[in-house]
Amino acid sequence: MATYFFLGLLLTAVGTSSSSSASDLEGTWTTKSRQVVTGPGFYDPIGDKFLEPNLTGISYSFSADGHYEEAYYRAIANPQDPSCPKGVMQWQHGTYTVNSDGSVDLTPIAVDGRQLLSDPCQSSTGTYTRYNQTEHFESFAVSVDSYHGVQRLDVKNFDGSPMHPMYLIYKPPQMLPTQTLNPSSSSKSKRQVEGGTGGRFSIKDLVSREKVGDPNNWLWLGIFMTTLGGITFFRS
């Protein structure tokens, strides 16, 4: 009996051991819906538009040579009117550095980031803008998830709060080209988008798929309010 007990402890220790070296970050990571994934399936730099996933979530990709890409698709709860949430899609890419203390700094290419904000109870059009937000992760850890049996990435934000866990879906990562994709001289400015991304960004559908009462949506309200400060509006 004691043998089985200690064997169980050993297996648990192996399943939950984690590491936090720069090489462990390499790959494309996504939250449990596995629908939001970086790369050409989320943002089209040629058409300069978003492509709406079937479910909400976040995704980060890290290359071995120091480049990263991120994709966000979230519903933002409205405390004053729970039946009237906002929707936000965000994309940016750039370079990252893993510091000696285990923290990570992400520096985006300022002219390339994009955000689409939809507030259907205020307007039938979404607002499409350039987006630029540097990020700092206090720490990260990569382990084998004991339930799903796949590699899992746990990240703590700059203030120590945990992000939603992400799971490895591609290695090498699935990313768009890492150079500047939208030079400022040729990129579009803030604009109104009828129906979101070519008619696909449907916040009402989003609410029916992922209920606004989900506590995860309320958690992201605070994150949204923080990152909103990073939006750069630019001339039409």
From Swiss-Prot:
UniProt-recorded name of the protein: Protein rot1
Signal peptide: 1-22
MF terms (GO), sorted A to Z: unfolded protein binding
Family per record: Belongs to the ROT1 family.
Keyword annotations of the record: Endoplasmic reticulum, Glycoprotein, Membrane, Signal, Transmembrane, Transmembrane helix
Topology Lumenal: residue spans: 23-217
Cytoplasmic side: 235-236
Annotated membrane topology: Single-pass type I membrane protein
Ranges annotated as spanning the membrane: 218-234
Residues carrying sugar: 54, 132
Disordered: annotated span: 178-197
A Pfam family of this chain: Rot1
A Gene Ontology cellular-component term: endoplasmic reticulum membrane
Bias type Polar residues, positions: 178-187
Organism in which the protein naturally occurs: Aspergillus niger (strain ATCC MYA-4892 / CBS 513.88 / FGSC A1513)
Main location: endoplasmic reticulum
Primary role: Required for normal levels of the cell wall 1,6-beta-glucan. Involved in a protein folding machinery chaperoning proteins acting in various physiological processes including cell wall synthesis and lysis of autophagic bodies.
Protein localization: Endoplasmic reticulum membrane
Single GO BP term: 'de novo' protein folding
